[in-house]
């Protein structure tokens, strides 16, 4: 028996091209009974373990670390023998890069193996002597001395010396081969017959190992493998629990909120809301999700209390009355016929997923609150990986080959809708591209190999994990920004560990809403209160939407969206939700049908009257997932949970799954007095549209956000457009459109007059002043200096042009340079002065001083706006 102990995956960034799955596949192909992963991190551990579990092969996990010994760096492998050892490995991964690393605290349940490196050549150090020296630090360790030549490499002889704790393995020596995969991006640079090397897996087979090692050594390796018991399934987190009576706490909070809500809305059906709340709480508590809702509620409450604007809701969570009562969402799910079971169902495995939109500028405050409230040990942000894409792969490989022009040539000829993975040199019909691919075939084929490989770790833009016990006991961590922990497990695997993920998404539109409302609201009203008072039936707002005045309006700016708005002519929030749902690939085909049915009426003769009310609200077109659920419930007499499971199954397009569900649907329909013909017609109709159905809960949440922005644009046009002008720096095309809207609305566009303008765009008395910072060559420092000059001008409004220029040049006031003054003059900053008088005097003054400051310009009128000065 043989097992490769030193193997790297592509999570040892730029040092391997083996995915954890490929590593397992290699071991399976050679009929090895176990496989080991020893990256310098634990990013791939979960993926590796699950791949081993699926392949029925024993996994061994280790960590490559470096320690200092007698002024030398020594590479070691620390391999976990037990789950306790793996937990120590996770702790070690957190601190392994610290100077003067001491391994002793992390060795319980682990084996240490010396892994020689290029620094420890036979002619510069005696690895055997080194190993004996290390054994002084790690008592009761035995050492072997047999040198092993690494195959398929021209590198020096490599020694592998094994140190093992006598208490865990008997004193017999064994010597497994250290074999670092040579299929690596790093070696691409060192060894240019590289395509051959990329295709060759330097993974020692059992047959080759038997020729290198003695039976005694292989037997000892077998003992190590047999004694290693690593099982991630036993390290899953327990359910999130913020209190021993979390279910009671949630119920009390919701009951109190419902009482207040019904008091403010006495016209509502009290029994309907109470029954809905009781049902939701029963499902939530049966699945042990109460703490999850309490945590989200706490985050939202913190935001409300600290003037941090939260979105009205996104995703299927908008369909929850509990979420609505806790102010997590702002759409009444009962009034809007939303379905809770689309969000949480006992028929569906998985944790709840509530995404919170937060104003972008204050998102970090919420994350800081999470860390302080629940503890640094119990919280972490989530790792993500930047991956090689077509362009980055070609360019990076081009650099390795010193063939940048070849990479750029390929990129220039590559169809925009194709990736390298989709191209076959023999199947390309474009002769120009075919010639390019053949000319740079090696470059192309190597780049293809690394597409979608992880390049480096990063931090997920929104994800946060919160648990009630130290996170390091379940998953590996690393230290990220602000000294906060970051998981070494990506988003894809968190739920497998039973870890609750909270998405806190920064949204610039919420920042805009907050700052615009802050500028226009009465002082005694909060931003949230102001938004809640916005009428949802404002005719002027819907007229603007129909007229396509949507520049800066959330989700509705694109040409396609404007076209749909003009056709549909929305007049309520539900219409806006339909617009958002229809303008997507797939459903777009139904836009014309929907508009025709809406404007001209639609034939209801083929629609069973029992499902007509469900389709009537969308004029006979199946648009929303909730409609599929309600139809399945009505026809097949399913519960809402079963109906949602049916919807999910049908949408997957799996023929066997569809047939299984078709049978149960027909049985339910026939038992519910539907004919086979009617049931077949309805099922086929559902099957046709189910894959494109949109979540009504999400659509309504985002429709409200779109409406808020449209209402602000309609009633506070100046503040709305001005905000976007000042926050779209670098997007000149959008700024041009915003400026044109100002002109169309009767505003005069003025140069950045030195006595009126600000650093950014500003408005006074229907005059829009360009900002100092917009002038090419003028930065924040100069713009701030000009505002300082402006303060002096306010106190001395009759200062001449010469005096003003001197102020700008004064080191105590402006501190600008002559070149800055020229830029200001060209941009029209001095147009506020009497052109025929002040400019003649100024030019005369500067000519006498031997300074030709101002360019030659007509003296009878100030220059028009020189848009080139502003990059337009």
From Swiss-Prot:
Q: Name one Pfam family in it.
A: PHP
The alphabetized list of GO BP terms reads: DNA replication
Any one GO CC term of the record: cytoplasm
User: Cellular location of this protein?
Assistant: Cytoplasm
Domain of life where this protein originates? Bacteria
Q: Which UniProt keywords apply?
A: Cytoplasm, DNA replication, DNA-directed DNA polymerase, Nucleotidyltransferase, Transferase
Task: Write the protein's name.
Answer: DNA polymerase III subunit alpha
Primary location group: cytoplasm
């Amino acid at each position: 028996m043989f097992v490769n102990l030193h193997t790297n995956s592509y999570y040892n960034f730029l040092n391997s091209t083996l995915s954890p799955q490929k590593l397992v596949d290699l071991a399976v192909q050679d009929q090895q009974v176990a496989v080991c992963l020893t990256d310098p991190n634990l990013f791939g551990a979960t993926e590796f373990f699950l791949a081993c579990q699926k392949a029925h092969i024993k996994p061994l996990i280790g960590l490559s670390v470096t320690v200092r010994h007698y002024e030398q760096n020594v590479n070691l492998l620390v391999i976990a023998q037990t789950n306790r050892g793996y937990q120590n490995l996770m702790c070690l991964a957190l601190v392994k890069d610290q100077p003067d690393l001491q391994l002793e605290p992390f060795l319980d349940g682990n084996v240490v193996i010396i892994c020689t490196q290029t620094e420890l050549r036979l002619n510069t150090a005696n690895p055997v002597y080194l190993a004996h020296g290390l054994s002084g630090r790690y008592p009761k360790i035995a050492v072997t001395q047999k040198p092993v030549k690494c195959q398929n490499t021209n590198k020096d002889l490599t020694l592998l010396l094994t140190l093992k704790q006598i208490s865990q393995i008997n004193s017999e020596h064994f010597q497994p081969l250290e074999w670092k995969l040579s299929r690596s991006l790093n070696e691409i640079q060192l060894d240019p017959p590289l395509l051959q090397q990329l295709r060759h897996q330097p993974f020692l087979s059992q047959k080759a190992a038997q020729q290198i090692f003695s039976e005694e050594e292989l037997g000892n390796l077998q003992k190590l493998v047999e004694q290693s018991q690593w099982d991630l399934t036993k390290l899953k987190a327990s359910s999130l629990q913020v209190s021993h009576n979390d279910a009671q706490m949630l119920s009390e909070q919701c009951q109190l909120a419902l009482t207040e809500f019904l008091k403010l809305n006495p016209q509502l059906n009290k029994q309907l809301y109470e029954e809905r709340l009781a049902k939701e709480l029963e499902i939530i508590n049966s699945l042990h999700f109460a703490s999850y809702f309490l945590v989200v509620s706490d985050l939202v409450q913190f935001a409300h209390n600290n003037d941090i604007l939260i979105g009205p809701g996104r995703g299927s969570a908008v369909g929850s009355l509990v979420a609505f009562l806790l102010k997590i969402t702002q759409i009444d799910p009962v009034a809007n016929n939303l379905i809770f079971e689309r969000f949480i169902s006992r028929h569906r495995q998985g944790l709840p997923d509530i995404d919170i939109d937060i104003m972008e500028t204050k998102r970090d405050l919420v994350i800081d609150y999470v860390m302080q409230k629940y503890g640094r040990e119990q919280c972490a942000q989530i790792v993500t990986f930047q991956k090689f894409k077509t362009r980055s792969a070609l360019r990076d490989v081009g650099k390795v080959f010193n063939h940048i022009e070849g990479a750029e040539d390929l990129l220039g000829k590559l169809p925009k809708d194709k990736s390298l993975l989709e191209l076959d040199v023999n199947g390309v019909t474009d002769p120009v591209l075919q010639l390019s691919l053949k000319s740079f075939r090696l470059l192309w084929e190597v780049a293809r190999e690394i597409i979608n490989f992880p390049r480096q770790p990063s931090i997920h833009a929104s994800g946060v994990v919160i648990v009630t016990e130290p996170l390091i006991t379940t998953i590996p961590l690393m230290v990220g920004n602000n000294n906060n922990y970051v998981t070494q497990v990506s988003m894809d695997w968190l739920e497998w560990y039973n870890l609750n993920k909270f998405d806190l998404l920064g949204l610039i539109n919420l920042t805009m809403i907050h700052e615009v409302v802050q500028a226009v609201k009465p002082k005694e009203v909060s931003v949230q209160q102001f938004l809640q008072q916005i009428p949802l039936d404002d005719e002027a707002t819907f007229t603007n939407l129909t007229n396509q005045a949507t520049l800066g309006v959330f989700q509705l700016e694109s040409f396609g969206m404007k076209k749909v708005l003009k056709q549909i002519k929305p007049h309520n929030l539900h219409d806006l939700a339909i617009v958002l749902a229809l303008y997507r690939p797939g459903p777009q085909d139904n836009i014309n049908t929907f508009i025709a049915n809406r404007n001209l009426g639609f034939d209801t003769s083929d629609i069973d009257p029992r499902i007509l009310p469900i389709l009537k609200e969308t004029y006979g077109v199946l648009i929303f997932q909730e409609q599929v659920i309600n139809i399945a419930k009505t026809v097949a007499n399913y519960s809402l949970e079963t109906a949602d499971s049916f919807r999910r199954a049908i949408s997957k397009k799996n023929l066997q799954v569809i047939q299984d569900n078709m049978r149960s649907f027909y049985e339910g329909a026939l038992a519910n007095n539907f004919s086979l013909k009617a049931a077949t017609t309805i099922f086929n109709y559902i099957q046709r549209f189910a894959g494109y159905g949109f979540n009504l809960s999400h659509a309504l949440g985002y429709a409200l956000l779109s409406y808020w922005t449209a209402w602000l644009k309609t009633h506070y046009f100046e503040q709305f457009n001005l905000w976007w002008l000042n926050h779209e720096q670098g997007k000149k095309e959008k700024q041009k459109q915003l400026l044109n809207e100002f002109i169309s609305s009767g505003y005069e566009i003025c140069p950045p007059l030195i006595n009126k303008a600000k650093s950014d765009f500003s408005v006074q008395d229907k005059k829009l002043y360009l900002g100092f910072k917009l002038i090419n060559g003028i930065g924040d420092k100069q713009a701030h200096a000009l505002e300082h000059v402006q303060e002096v001008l306010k106190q001395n409004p009759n200062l001449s042009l010469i005096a003003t220029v001197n102020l700008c040049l004064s080191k105590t006031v402006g501190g600008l340079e002559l070149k800055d003054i020229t830029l200001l003059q060209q941009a029209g900053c001095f147009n506020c002065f009497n052109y025929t008088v002040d400019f003649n005097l100024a030019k005369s003054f500067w000519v006498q001083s031997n300074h030709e400051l101002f360019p030659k310009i007509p003296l009878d009128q100030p220059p028009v706006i020189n848009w080139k000065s502003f990059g337009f």
